[in-house]
């Protein structure tokens, strides 16, 4: 818990922007502020000490424009920079704890230079053949941009795939460097579809 009278509490109150739009209690840390970054990294180190090996850096691209950044950055231009600052803050802690060769985060957003902090996944696709094709194009674009490792939500994230989409996406997804069955409203497990999927 956070001691409300501590210096860390003051950093939290001044440098974490909180909003309930996409999910309750979602907070964005101002990574342009070294104190806020250090506070956040200290929280990650506590989790690593408990055995956590990897962190998912989600929502790095949904940056509000009605905020004031500690370093004075233009809020309209933070869309790409924020994702780099966020992923870098997390990746640096993982490198410190696990070494450069074993540090892995699971990032949804990226910008130029992001390929140095693997792994990235394609975000929230829908459960359709068209979205699977979009995911493939996204992965090819990542590869052409120097990203050696990438992943995606097998079967799509939004909605529930039919058995055909799930099986085709599984075949495609298991050929990637990192595979993940994941969805927002239904389980993505083979036995939820049909015998052939198992």
Stretches with model-predicted labels:
Residues 13-15, 72:
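Detector for glycine-centered tight turns/loop "hinges" at secondary-structure junctions
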Residues 41-55, 60-198:
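Active-site-proximal substrate-binding groove within the catalytic cores of carbohydrate-active enzymes
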Residues 1, 29-37, 79-80, 198:
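Short acidic-aromatic active-site loops that bind/stabilize oxyanions
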Residues 1-8, 12:
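Single conserved hydrophobic/aromatic residue that forms the stacking wall/gate
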């Amino acid at each position: 818990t956070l001691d409300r009278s501590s210096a860390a509490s003051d950093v939290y109150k001044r440098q974490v922007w909180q909003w309930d739009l996409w999910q309750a209690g979602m907070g964005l840390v101002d990574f342009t502020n070294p104190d806020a970054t250090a506070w956040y990294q200290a929280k990650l180190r506590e989790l690593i000490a408990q055995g956590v090996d990897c962190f998912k850096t989600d929502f790095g691209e949904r940056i509000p424009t009605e905020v004031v950044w500690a370093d004075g950055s233009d809020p309209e231009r933070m869309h790409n920079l924020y994702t780099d600052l966020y992923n870098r803050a997390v990746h640096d802690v993982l490198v410190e704890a696990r070494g450069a060769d074993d540090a892995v985060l699971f990032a949804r957003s990226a910008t130029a230079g992001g390929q140095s902090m693997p792994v990235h996944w394609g975000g929230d696709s829908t459960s359709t053949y068209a979205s699977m094709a979009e995911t493939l194009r996204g992965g090819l674009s990542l590869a052409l941009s120097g990203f050696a490792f990438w992943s995606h939500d097998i079967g799509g994230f939004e909605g529930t795939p039919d058995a055909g989409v799930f099986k085709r996406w599984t075949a495609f997804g298991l050929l990637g460097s990192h595979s993940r069955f994941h969805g927002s409203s239904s389980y993505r497990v083979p036995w939820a579809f049909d015998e052939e999927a198992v």
